[in-house]
Regions:
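Flexible loop/hinge segments at secondary-structure junctions
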Residues: 3-226
Length: 226
């Protein structure tokens, strides 16, 4: 099993709803990925100046899935290397809506988006071939081992793990230790950190997501607040 390591609701195999209640991609994404979709004729995917030396015929296409942050990466890869992928791009002049639905269903067999938690589940259950995202969590590694699957981790890029504050918050610099103190509940107010006398509301991503796994990696043995 391959992991590329970078830091209408969908139903899974047992008919439970897949959703994180986000605003886009049927509740699976917190950002609109439309501009990164190959099917969008106005997509902003980076493109090569010449044809890729790696060209895969459709019978060789691998089923890709992954994290929200990684979607532009693997979508651009497929756009460059999957021979004939352009046939899935919408033609506004001739394509009817029911035809778009049919094309979407076939296209998403190869370039799917289920975000980290569900995409990883699909990987270890052999419903996708390559997962693009951050390192798997300890729980995800245990799940793979329980199924007798060995994960092959291939680093392809580096990314920064960035913490944001509200635009009205004057705090603009925190140490790693200060962040750890926030997320273990030791620091509960912005004032000691140079901010206003206000309670800290520390946002976390869903368990098993790439961002949450990276947060757990940073925290180490330090417990994280609920």
């Amino acid at each position: 099993l391959s992991c590329s390591f970078i830091i209408n609701y969908t139903l899974n195999n047992n008919n439970t709803i897949r959703s994180h209640n986000f605003a886009y991609e049927n509740g699976l994404s917190s950002v609109d990925l439309k501009k990164y979709k190959i099917t969008n004729p106005d997509n902003i995917l980076p493109k090569l100046n010449e044809i890729s030396t790696l060209q895969l015929a459709q019978e060789e296409w691998l089923r890709l899935d992954g994290a929200e942050a990684a979607y532009p990466v693997y979508s651009a890869y497929a756009n460059a290397c999957y021979d004939g992928i352009a046939k899935y791009q919408y033609n506004r002049n001739t394509l009817q809506w029911h035809e778009q639905d049919k094309i979407n269903a076939e296209f998403e067999k190869y370039i799917a988006f289920n975000n980290t938690v569900y995409a990883f589940t699909d990987l270890i259950n052999k419903n996708c071939d390559i997962f693009f995202g951050a390192m798997p969590s300890k729980q995800q590694q245990l799940e793979a081992a329980a199924l007798g699957e060995e994960l092959v981790l291939t680093p392809i890029a580096k990314e920064a793990f960035v913490f944001f504050v509200n635009s009205t918050n004057p705090v603009n610099n925190l140490t790693t230790q200060q962040i750890k103190d926030i997320y273990n509940g030791k620091t509960k107010n912005w004032q000691p950190l140079g901010g206003d006398d206000r309670r800290i509301l520390a946002f976390q991503r869903p368990e098993g997501s790439g961002s949450q796994t990276l947060l757990q990696h940073i925290m180490g043995d330090t417990p994280i607040i609920e």
